[in-house]
Amino acid sequence: RKITIYGLDVSGQNVEKAGQTIRKAFQDKKVVFREDGSQVYQTTVGELGYSLDEGTLQSALTALKQQRDQTRTFLASWKNYEIEYQVNKDEIAEQAALTEDHFGEKERTEAQNAEIRYSKKNKKFVIVKQVAGTQIDEERLRNYVDKTLEAEFQDQLLTGEVKIDLNQQAYK
């Protein structure tokens, strides 16, 4: 009987082994940061300090096994299950993984507000346009990553890779 949990095949595994497989797949899930269309940093969910709560996962897997044992059929078909889980986060690991120096050699510019200046040369006032900066604000970046990963976990907890585009939500 083929069984997948959030798209991850755990067929033929006992509760403990399935739990290990799920936790490893979760922690090894790639997170790719892109800026201006190219990759600038790659890490994993685990390196960002995220993990699945072992107790919650074991309870959910045990309950699923009991449910499946009660409804055993001769010709069971493949089924994908979504079980209860809890994500834990290590703030210190996340801070260490999301420092500005991880994001390439690109020269970063400071944001500048629009302003009006008097040009002595032209003898008139000139509007200097606002310039969006590219300096990374680490706190804003962490909040942006947290929100992005939270949404990703709802859609694809264990499969695929997360792509995060650096933009104004992560800049100062």
What label would you give each PLM region?
Residues 1-172:
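Surface-exposed, secretory/extracytoplasmic low-complexity segments enriched in Ser/Thr/Asn/Gly/Pro
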